[in-house]
């Protein structure tokens, strides 16, 4: 459960332990690392300690403000937060004119000279939603508390019935929104137009499936059977600023799918990705490339939560 104000001493203790473990290079215990994936390096960029940042499930690096990350919670009342790369909340924005069901991911992009944020209301744990929404908001020029209204929204459905989706990314150069299913095995990749010509309900196009998703080994299943079955559920996705890599986060792993120039995503995700273990997170839910494309930021739900910068 998220830490509340009466438990600040406990939060501080946990935060201290996380920092100590990270600085010591042991964010995961040896018994936890049953796989031998050669992974990227990671460092602690900051800690999320603010009670308002207690269920972060979406993260996007600002291209407008240096060292600023946009975030939103899974639960709550539909707010966007601007935070420093150290984890400090800088401003809070309320989104008017939208009905919020289950926000699960977000992305930052530039289209025709306009810098924007996309918020994905695509969560569906129960598999009951007939339609889902994506909201595009112009990125605020000032980091001051304010109310925002979407520039446009997209209502869509899946082609063959409901599914849970927590991973959404934007390929602005190709005018595409990419969506990855959470619980299907193998994970499915879908696409939607970033700027549809009309306002009707769209149907997402199935692009393909993601190759190379790790499977739990016998030892991991024996030690933690419930967790092992969830480790490959997809919780976030991001396209690099140069459009050359799709990053996919699960509860345990980071997968990187490089793409050749002019190659379609269906081909890129059909090849074995670069796979590595994530640094420790209480519940890995949020990921995006840094604005310069040199690394990725990752964090998770609950507080305190570490905010990592990962260098592939």
Which ranges hold each PLM region?
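Bacterial N-terminal signal peptides
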Residues: 14-22
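Sequence/structural signature of beta-propeller domains
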Residues: 26-312
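Bacterial N-terminal signal peptides that target proteins for export
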Residues: 2-15
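Generic low-polarity alpha-helical segments
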Residues: 10-13, 25-29
